[in-house]
Curated annotation (Swiss-Prot):
One of its GO terms (biological process) is cell wall organization. It comes from Shewanella amazonensis (strain ATCC BAA-1098 / SB2B). Mg(2+) 1 binds at D284, E297. It is found in: Cytoplasm. This is D-alanine--D-alanine ligase. Its EC number is 6.3.2.4. Pathway: Cell wall biogenesis; peptidoglycan biosynthesis. Mg(2+) 2 binds at E297, N299. It is an enzyme of class 6 (ligase). GO terms for molecular function: ATP binding; D-alanine-D-alanine ligase activity; metal ion binding. Its cofactor is Mg(2+); Mn(2+).
Length: 336
């Protein structure tokens, strides 16, 4: 049997750099059980350098090999890479574009699918095109007085809004607006995080999540899990990743009827297939009190920390993450 050299790439230098390192540790623990892979941990720094765990700066070349600063070390040929980078430049599709150019196989969604899902405005256009209901919204391209007036009008109609940087992940640059007078400041603040902003109607609803992934030639959608925030508050970046988070998670959402479960899974599969995702994603929904289903967002590289939902839902569905990972990699490298 062939053994393959695999780069586990993490970090990225963005707002989710440290979370990426935690997720990479989960990948590393799984890869340690798979004898067919030699794994090299690389951290992509904010300066754009590749750094080994020992702190050595290396180069990942267009020839798909690692070159070390110590020229006495032979180049290390790379067969495959796992870009475990949340946010920029991983989930944005940027680094996948480079891998495509140098023909380096990688784990996760492709560059276009990643970009389409990461930008909240583009994603909503796709959801609507696929016939998947989503939250009412408007988008802004500048923090002008006219734009702020449009948000105030939406606030008057909807009662409350979320103001979100259109191209950030994990609730970064997202602000709930409960008072009209807060809107100008929050709009300007959101524009500090991205060149476009999306404003959504606040939905009072349960937050359900579905793990969708490729497994042995089939696309699997789990039964929805649920996040219950403390005091029904906004699921912030801190609530998502702090080990002291007060949010409660259910690997399978309680008290959801089978018809609704089936509809949610159908929408999740429709989004995964229609947007040409691959390998894995976490697809998040709102479920309102009157049983209305709204697709909230798609995470093309979901967190894999000790409190993350994706690996828990996969295991609850009866699949082992290491086995899932191995078959995904070998399917690409060996055409299985």
């Amino acid at each position: 049997m062939n053994k393959y050299n695999l780069v586990l790439l993490c970090g990225g230098g963005g707002s989710e750099h440290d979370i990426s390192l935690l997720s990479a540790k989960y990948f590393e623990s799984c890869l340690a059980t798979l004898p067919r892979f030699n794994t090299l941990w690389l951290e992509l720094t904010a300066e754009g350098q590749f750094r080994t765990r020992e702190g050595e700066i290396v180069e990942l070349t267009n020839r798909r090999e690692i070159r070390f600063a110590d020229e006495a070390k032979a180049p290390w040929s790379v067969d495959y890479v796992i870009p475990c980078i949340h946010g920029y430049p991983g989930e944005t599709g940027d680094i996948q574009s480079w891998f495509n150019l140098i023909r380096l196989p990688y784990f996760g969604c492709g560059s276009e699918a990643s970009s389409n899902c990461f930008n909240k405005i583009t994603a909503k256009m796709w959801f609507s095109a696929l016939g998947i209901p989503n939250t009412p919204y408007l988008y802004l391209d500048e923090p002008s007085n006219d734009a702020i007036a449009r948000v105030e009008a939406a606030f008057d109609e909807w009662g409350s809004v979320f103001i979100k940087a259109a191209s950030q992940g994990s609730s970064v640059g997202c602000f709930p607006a409960h008072r009209r007078e807060d809107i100008p400041g929050l709009v300007r603040k959101a524009f500090e995080y991205a060149p476009f902003v999306v404003v959504e109607k606040t939905i009072k609803a349960r937050e359900l999540e579905v793990a969708v992934y490729d497994y042995q030639g089939e696309i699997v959608a789990t039964r929805p899990g649920e996040i219950v925030c403390a005091a029904n508050t906004f699921y912030s970046f801190e609530e998502k990743y702090d080990t002291k988070s007060q949010a409660v998670t259910h690997v399978e959402a309680p008290d959801v009827d089978e018809e609704t479960v089936a509809a949610i899974r159908d929408y999740a599969l429709r989004a995964f297939k229609g947007m040409k995702l691959r390998h894995l994603s976490r697809i998040d929904f709102f479920l309102t009190e009157d049983n209305q289903i709204l697709l909230n967002e798609i995470n093309t590289f979901p967190g894999l920390t000790q409190i993350s939902m994706f690996p828990k839902m996969l295991a609850h569905h009866g699949h082992d993450f290491a086995t899932f990972l191995e078959q995904a990699i070998l399917a690409e490298l060996e055409g299985r």
